[in-house]
Amino acid sequence: RGRVAVMGTTSTFSEQSRAGAGRPDFPGRPGVNALRHDLVHHVERGFFDSLQQGMEALGYKDIQDARKAFGFRGLEEAKPDITEIEFLENKFLLGEEFGVSTSANQDDLDGMAKWIRGATKQADWVVYGAHCHESGNTGEFHGITRISPPEFLIEAAHWAIDQGADLFAGHGPHFLRGIEIYNNRPIFYSLGNFIFQNESVLWMPDEAYRRFNLGYDQTPGDYLDTRSGGGTRAFAADPVF
């Protein structure tokens, strides 16, 4: 018998959904406790040179320079174009081979740490959850997500345990991922679906219907049946879900 603290974060969110800090002269913005991450695409020389050429030919380099000169990019350091390019809001880094890497945002990790350490003083056990649809670079696909967890989620899970969490529980991709015992404490990278009510939604927005050329006479049941191809694709057809 004891007290359990349950806390959580999400790495899958729209930017406007993220909670924002307040100031003495401005209230904080309510929102989700976000776990941001840095995504880097490592590319070989030929691809990198083509990106540079495309940036200039399409005018994106001029737009970036104008934004920096106008001050809209804040005090960010100038990136060396000889090794790093930001193209269509994606970061590309010159390397020896192609690859993708991710790392957790340190400010968000520090925020996690503060509240985990506080919870350990008020509870007997601390459970930390993370909603994460992103995936790693290996393993088979189920839907648009791979079996492997992303690097930044592994980093965050280890960090949470190091700060005092007794258990880290991931969810989001709708299927089971691996389990790790880290410092004698369990990490579940995805618990899958204990209860999945994807097909029991009562209302759908108009654009959802229009995506499948459905009109005003159709119901949510019609939409869901059309989306799943009559149960032949997506969640309904893959037993892993």
What do these predicted regions represent?
Residues 1-241:
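Acidic, metal/ion-coordinating pockets
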